[in-house]
Design a protein with these regions (language model features):
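Catalytic/RNA-binding core of pseudouridine synthases
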Residues: 1-221
Length: 221
């Protein structure tokens, strides 16, 4: 996506679609927009992990930030690149490696496992997540070396195989709010018996908002 001029008038209110760059937090986008526009009331309609890229629906002005929950409830779509044969503690590329395997699943095995990731399923959130349990965020406990029992959450997903050439598995995933793509990758690895983690993640859609409609932030000094 090419960079485009960010609206600057302080009275601007509305929705701004950004393509989040890799390595940046969702709050980074909020802070940059606040600085560029002078508007303090800026939020978003769903966070992305730092390693992920893609659609960020930025809500500018009080009339839109107060609608955050409505936008957050939208279904999402992702292109996930999953590396097989390696398991990390965070289920993604930023985590520490905790297991390795030389097993190379066949395409038939991949197809069979993916049938478990269609429709309504129960999903256990990863320890490295912002989900709260007993008043604490799970990632805070994980950083202390703790692992606690997590309540499974019901989500609805549709998984499409895009490409498979060991060790790289590429999937398109449509899902409801609160679905952890990292958990899908981890669970696939467990079912295949080889381990897996998300090595690249692109959010391609958030509700009606598509990646091709997003702009990139201008370079920051």
């Amino acid at each position: 996506m090419t960079s485009s001029t960010i609206p600057n008038p302080t009275k601007t209110q509305g929705i701004l679609l950004l393509d989040k760059p890799e390595g940046k937090t969702s709050f980074y986008l909020v802070s940059v927009l606040r600085r560029l526009t002078g508007i303090k009331k800026i939020g978003h309609a769903g966070t992305l992990d730092p390693f992920a890229t893609g659609v960020m629906v930025m809500l500018v002005g009080q009339n839109f930030t107060r609608l955050a929950e409505k936008f957050q409830n939208h279904d999402k779509a992702y292109r996930a690149t999953i590396t097989l044969g390696i398991e990390t503690d965070s289920y993604d590329i930023d985590g520490e490696i905790v297991a390795k395997s030389d097993k190379a699943p066949t395409l038939e095995e991949i197809h069979e496992v993916l049938t478990s990731f269609q429709g309504t399923v129960k999903q256990i959130p990863p320890m490295f997540s912002a989900k709260r349990q007993n008043g604490k965020k799970l990632y805070e406990l994980a950083r202390q070396g703790l692992s606690v029992e997590r309540e499974p959450k019901t989500v609805t997903i549709k998984t499409i195989l895009v490409d498979y050439e060991y060790p790289i598995l590429t999937l398109d995933i449509d899902c409801t709010k609160g679905t952890y793509i990292r958990s899908i990758a981890h669970d696939i690895g467990q079912m295949l018996g080889c381990g897996a983690f998300v090595s690249k993640l692109v959010r391609t859609r958030s509700g009606p908002f598509q990646l091709q409609d997003c702009i990139s932030l201008p370079p920051q000094g």
